[in-house]
Amino acid sequence: IVRYIYKGVKAMKPWVKVSTCPVGKYRDTSRYPSRGWNAFFTVYQDPQGWMGEGIMDQIYPMMYFQGNNFYPFALDWQEQSNGRQVVPGLGIYFLHPDEGKWTRDEIDRQMNFIRSQKMAGEGHYRVKYLMENTQGIYDELAENFYAYPALQPPMPWLDNVPPTAPSELKVTDINNGYTELKWQAATDHDSRNNPLYVIYASNEFPVDTNRPENIVAQGVRETSYIYAPILPWNAKKHFAVTAIDRCGNESAAVQK
């Protein structure tokens, strides 16, 4: 069934991510046992097999555990991912006293571990507890972990060719401290995978497009953009524009 669905989706829209939310432990690992409840033997899921065969793009394992029930199994997912994207789901609902006795430090440790292993991200279950800022988790994420924008991780197993770069960037100061950017479009002609644009701004030239704090907009469809800084006295002086396709491949930048 999984193979049939994957091939059907890719035949119609190759850039669409096929993903699944498996049980948090695949099976026993050499580091720690799953203690009888796992994806492979208990509920008959084989997400590591699907990733190995190349018929799954992302997995979101439900890893609502602590300590040895979390770290060995998170590492196992990443090691057996075949380069696909692993996004562990974290049990932030345990921060609420009616659900458990976790502290925010537990979530911090898990997120730092995920980043140290270069996984594709993390999910938070349930969003109710995130939006209610349980134990300050929303503020913590906004101030520290998610302080800057992020681009989608690329999917090189589907397409690893970046779009051509936009060109002829023009920067014009207009009224009220706003700045207008205009550029020539990337010259790719795949109507099913037209690139979008990412705008970067900095006081340093050239603008470093590897620094997420320099991203001011993404998903821009047009070949123009009005830069309107929240604090006019903190407006940036230099700009860069890149093209990005549906598979997350980013072009070189045109700078001004």
Task: Report each predicted region and the residues it spans.
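Short S/T/G- and acidic-enriched coil/turn segments that sit immediately N-terminal to beta-strands
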Residues: 221-227
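Beta-strand-rich modules
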Residues: 227-250
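Solvent-exposed loop/turn segments flanking beta-strands in beta-repeat/beta-sandwich domains
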Residues: 186-212, 236
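Short beta-strand segments within Ig-like beta-sandwich modules, predominantly Fibronectin type-III
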Residues: 215-221
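Pro/Thr/Ser/Gly-rich low-complexity, intrinsically disordered linker/stalk tracts
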Residues: 136-192, 233, 247-256
